[in-house]
């Protein structure tokens, strides 16, 4: 009979010993791995907050009171119209009032009427309060936002008739709403390739908005032809623990703003879950001539 070699004489127990050691070590390694990943996640969360724009309010001339009209749609089809009224009701306040509604055959399928009012500080361009009402065929949603230096309180009612408001608090210093974020960005130099990052709370959630100045170009809209500043907008949702999450419905948007003393919002093209949607300036009139 042929004698067995040294490796062939190895017992089953000896062969299994490395596996036993691995099994014993793994429970100790896994918690360490999870702790490391949690640390990395926490560090990333802190890192994005460190990238927020810290530039003070710019010295670009403030916007004159105006009235403007827009149309909204997709693939060249107009689905809704809207009107805005920008005013300065007091020396220390800016105010934006807006209304919008679906039209045509789109309204037969999806009835929606919207009213919006936002008030911001004329000195700091920080939001004070926002009121938004959405009236659908079968329900009505009202959202009221009250801002402080430390965050925002949201009161929201939903239903056909009077309903109890559900409140929610989101604490984050130096928040913007949609209106004040536009005012702040408008005040900046907006040099080519510059990047601005702000946290905005438009209605129900907070988002990290990253705005990049792509460059300058000519654009024609219904209201006229303009030299324009072209901007890229990306959004990330901010979760309960301040972690960044992808926006479920919004991918990115391209925005054109007039490259003049007014810096009017001319056109937006947004990539969303249904395709490309747009908003375009139809007409504008100033209440105070130059």
Pin down the residues of each PLM region:
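Serine residues within intrinsically disordered or low-complexity segments
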Residues: 3-4, 22, 42-43
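Bacterial N-terminal signal peptides that target proteins for export
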Residues: 10, 16-33
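Bacterial N-terminal signal peptides
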Residues: 31-41
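An N-terminal domain-start capping segment
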Residues: 33, 124-130, 134-137, 172-181
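Acidic, serine/threonine-rich low-complexity disordered tracts
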Residues: 46-149, 189-290
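Hydrophobic, well-structured mid-protein blocks that either form specific transmembrane helices
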Residues: 145-187
């Amino acid at each position: 009979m042929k004698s067995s070699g040294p490796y062939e004489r190895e017992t089953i127990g000896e062969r299994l010993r490395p596996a036993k050691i691995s099994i014993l070590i793994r429970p100790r390694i896994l918690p360490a791995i999870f702790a490391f990943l949690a640390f990395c996640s926490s560090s990333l969360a802190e890192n994005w907050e460190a990238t927020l724009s810290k530039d003070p309010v710019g010295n670009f001339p403030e916007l004159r009171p105006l009235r403007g009209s827009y149309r909204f749609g997709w693939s060249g089809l107009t689905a809704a119209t809207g009107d805005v009224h920008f005013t300065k009701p007091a020396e220390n306040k800016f105010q934006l009032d807006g209304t919008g509604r679906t039209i045509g055959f789109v309204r037969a399928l999806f009835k929606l009427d919207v009213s919006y009012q936002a008030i911001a500080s004329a000195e700091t361009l920080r939001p004070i309060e926002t009121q938004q009402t959405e009236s659908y065929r079968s329900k009505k949603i009202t959202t009221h936002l009250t801002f402080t230096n430390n965050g925002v309180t949201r009161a929201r009612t939903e239903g056909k008739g009077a309903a109890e408001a559900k409140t929610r608090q989101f604490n984050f210093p130096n928040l913007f709403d949609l209106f004040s974020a536009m005012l702040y960005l408008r005040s900046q130099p907006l040099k080519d390739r510059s990047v601005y990052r702000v946290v905005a709370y438009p209605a129900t959630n907070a988002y990290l908005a990253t705005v990049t100045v792509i460059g300058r170009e000519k654009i024609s809209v219904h209201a006229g032809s303009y030299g324009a500043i072209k901007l890229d907008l990306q959004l990330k949702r901010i979760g309960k623990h301040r972690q960044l999450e992808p926006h479920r419905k919004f991918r990115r948007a391209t925005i054109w703003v007039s490259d003049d003393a007014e810096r009017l919002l001319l056109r937006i093209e947004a990539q969303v879950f249904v395709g490309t949607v747009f908003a375009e300036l139809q007409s504008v009139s100033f209440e105070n001539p130059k």
